[in-house]
Each structure stands twice: as structure tokens, then as C-alpha cells.
Amino acid sequence: KVLTIESLCSLIKDGTHQTPTYTEDTINGFKFLSSKDVMSKKIDWSDIKYIPSDLHEKLYAVVKPIKNDILMSKNGVNYGVAAVNDTDEVFDIYVSLALLRPKTDIINPVYFRSAINSPDTKRQFDSSIKGIGVPNLHLGEIKKTKILVPPVDKQNEYVSFVEQVDKSKYHGMFAFEMGVAA
């Protein structure tokens, strides 16, 4: 079936539209992600910013990311790039990210991420981009985007295959770096 992103999600929101006050306090501060922290398969936690706890409480009351949510970049050169939140970390998000909460009874989050990152979805995003200068995907356009959705058992097979390929790539790179590969 072909379904809209909106029909595949129980929640679609973006982060705060206010530029936050950041803190250097990584102990008491809370992680704050923007589009620069989302790669095509994962969240890059290596260079994130932090916000004070009082601001976190306000933001977290509105958007509360949970494990298996999809974080998708809405603007900038990486617009349309999605990653699965595979952690129970508590964090907040900026307006440059959309949070998509998949209905896991009809779509596997890892399959959903792959479908969003596909060339077909990128073409749909390209045709609905708003803004001169910095590209911007509006939530309304994201919701209307169509995704090919096979039965869940086929999605799960796909995910198992992709994970096995990723493991093979990792082991191959590790062996090469260790000088084991011929």
C-alpha cells in the first residue's frame, strides 16, 4: 500500500520555534538536538548543545521524544534526512527537526526511516520545499508525503537484512583497519 506519513504516525510535531539560551553545563543541562545532529541513519550525539533545566521543562511539556520516534531534518542542506531515536535519552528538539511517532502496528521504525531516506521520498520533498535561500519543509507537506508500506512481516524481513548488511560492513571495515583484510 501507499500511505501518507500522516496516516503512519500518531504524532507529528516540530521543536521549539524560539532560539534557546544554551548552557555549557553538561551535568545539569539537557541535550538539545537540531537538524545538524541527524544523519541518514542515526543521531550524532558528538557535538550537541545543552539547555538549562527550566527551559527543558517548558519544551518537554510540549514535545517529548521517545524511543523509536523518527527525527527528521526539516531545513537546511540536509532537509528530509531521518534517523530513528534508538535511545531512552531525555532531550529536546529545535524547530529544524520534525518528530514523527510511527504507529508501530503498521510500520517498523527502521523501515520507516529507510523509506523516508529513499530517493522517491526525497523527490517528493524536493517538489514541496518552501523558502528562498535556506530550504524548509513544512509539517503540512511532510504529512502529505507518500510512502510505500508493505505488510509488517515484509518490513521486518527488510530491517533484518539491512541490519545484517550493516554488521557485515562494520566487521569488514574493522578487519581492514586492523590489517586482517588481504
Label each residue range with its predicted role.
Residues 1-16, 144, 148-182:
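Non-catalytic DNA-recognition/assembly elements of restriction-modification systems
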